[in-house]
Amino acid sequence: MPEPILHSKFLSGLPAGRKNGVRHGEKPEKVGEKQFDFTRKIRELRLELEIKKREEERIEKDIAIILEENTIDGGEQNRSFGLAVTRLNNHMLVVENSAKQLTSALKNISVLADTISGRVSALDVAKTRVVGCLQLAGDMRDLGVCAEGIDDAIRSEDFETASQHIHRFLTLDQAVFQIREFKQKDATDSIRHSYEVLSSAKERLSKILKSRLTESVQKGDVAEMQRFIKMFPLIHEPDEGLQRYSVFLNQKIDKLAEDNLAIMKAGGTDDNRRNVLYADTLFMFFEGVAEIIESNLPVLEHSYGLEKLLDFMFILQARIDEFFRRLHEEFDTRRRLSHFNRLVDDVIHQKKAAEAVEDAPDPMEIDAIASEICMMNTSAEMYWRFVSRRIGKNEVIRSPSGDGDDEENEEARQERHRLRKEAKEQKMDQLLNRSRVGTKMQELIGNYCLLEHFYMLKSVQKAIKSDVKEDAGGLTSSIVDDVVFIIRKSIRRAAGSGNVDSVCATINNATALIDTVVHGHLRQSIQQGYVTSSNFASEAFTAYQQGKPVKEAADAQKEQFLLALNNSAKLSELLIELQKGLITEWAGVKRPDVEKNKLEHSTTQIEESAKKLASLAKHGVEELFKSAFKNKIKQGADPYQEIDRQMTMQDVEYYEAHDPFMEQFLAQIDRLLVENEPLLFADNYQTLLLLTSSEIARQIEQSLAKCQFNRYGALQLDREYRQICAYLTNVAGWSAREKVGRLGQIVSLLNVETIDEAMEVWHNSKAMTSSATIRTLTLPEVRKVLALRADFPTVAIKSIE
């Protein structure tokens, strides 16, 4: 393209680019298919490159002009900027060189570290081999020393030294004996000879120790027995030593058993304790066994370790089980336990009537047997706790010194310790719960629970039959103290046995008796009703048919009703006290969490029974209120609706001085309450007061619904409401105010000036009412209350929303 055309394009204001170049350039000639003209294409690209260069120069000049126009020292700044960029570039070059040097140094260090690590590893291997060689050399030296001294020690009867030599021989590394197989005769003859000498000496020493220990057992020489028993673990025959030593201890246990059984068959040493003869025998036997174990345990524990002590106890337990079998058979025969169990089971499960059973068990005899079983279980529990404390304790984990292997093997040591602990717990469970003593005591505890249930049942039934009023001025009868005494005695006896399951079973049976027998007896008396003048005629006719004096029958029924009412409330209170006392007493005893949860759940059953009795007492008070109070309150409140509420100021002032209704009404209520207060338990009287408060509020509210008020009538109503509140608060406390809270809302609505004020009062009462027992007036009820105001327009009341 000619130069003038380029010049004209550059000077024009059109933007330069490939498209303009193509547009102003010559159109390319059409070429044939699969042919390209690269010469023309290259020329166009060069042209565009030239245009871009000139544009760059123009832009740089424009930038320089702008900088010169806007800054005084534009050129100086450019130079400063250029120098700064140059310095930065120089610094970056220095950093790059330093980084290359650092990289090279790190590579060298890495190579050196790998070299050092390899050498350290080689040194560790060498150290391990050297230590192994030194250990092997030491073992070989010890092997020779043991072989040289073993025969002399046996000949001189220095069995302690001989046992030490054998122990060292048996604990040597097996690598020492593998040297015997090498072909070098000079290196193996000495080792082979030492091995044969020590193996032969071990057999001879084992026979000697067994023979000597057997002789000392036959002679009863305790010192010799304890001397030889210590050597069996050293020659790796601990079970043999325990078996032979247990022969001596089993002989002592058998002698102890025979002595105690002889005393038992002779009737004991104290005639006053014949009723607990078998419990005393078991206690003395376990105490003697504990002394035998305690005196011999230190020697065995030091020589055999805790794990072997448990195996040793299994050997002794066979003789203990045999004694307990004989004791249990004698106890079952002499105390007729199986016979009583059958009779008691028939009575409790109502297979036969209690009177129909021949030779029915005497509750006092059952009481003695139950106490003796508890004492027997207490002795067994004490013995098991002794065994668990002395033998069941776990060994402390000992971590060997060192860092490397110990850290790696710490988890393995913990796992081995856990497995040993689990195995030991299984053995302890086998010893404590699966032995004859354990299983038979569990069977006896089951028998005890059955006997205890029978004793409580018969005792409670006897307490009901012999129920009498305590004294002339008393509110309760003897059944309250008798039932609580029986239940407390049985629960504490079960707790004294040391078996938590028996405690839970006893509490369960006791609460079942309260909920059925005691509750049913009290409910029956309450359901007969309270005799008043209104129902006296029907009661008198019933008494006449039965041939009883009418007045005496009515008075007796009234007294029985009040006694049942007060007995229910008092018994509920005493059961709560019993529950709290048991919780406090058991809180000081250390028990597993499982047993604590069982006892906690059982004590809640006592609370539930107390709540049922309290509910029965409340029901009785309600029946008393319906019979003796409700109609009289209604009759006293009926004249209230006859008072004209369209009052004047003079009427209000007159009523303030001469109240025509409220004083007489409250005096009538007070006479009713005063008559019944001495007859009721405190909780029952409080319930009666609250029922009276609710009924007064209900009757007054019903009377108000039949009246029409003006402003002065509402003022008089407010005064009367305050009188009611003051009286009820005085006799029943602040809880009575909640019972008349709804009436207070009605009085507040009637004492407003306008409908708007009434709505404000209603909304405030809704916001301020926090008690769930006070029901706020609904909107329809508010309309009905405001309609009682004769001076309020009906249209305005209906428009309330």
Swiss-Prot record:
Q: Report the record's Gene Ontology biological process terms.
A: Golgi organization; gonad morphogenesis; protein transport; regulation of cell migration; retrograde vesicle-mediated transport, Golgi to endoplasmic reticulum
What cellular-component terms does GO give this entry? Golgi membrane; Golgi transport complex
Keyword Membrane belongs to the record: yes
Q: What does the UniProt entry say about where the protein is found?
A: Golgi apparatus membrane
Q: Which residues form a coiled coil?
A: none
Question: Could you confirm whether the keyword Protein transport appears in this record?
Answer: yes
Q: What is its main location?
A: Golgi
According to the record, the residues making up region (Disordered) are: 397-427
The job of this chain, per UniProt, is described as: Required for normal Golgi function.
How would you summarize the oligomeric state and partners of this protein? Component of the conserved oligomeric Golgi complex which is composed of eight different subunits and is required for normal Golgi morphology and localization.
Which family does this protein fall into? Belongs to the COG4 family.
Write the protein's name: Conserved oligomeric Golgi complex subunit 4
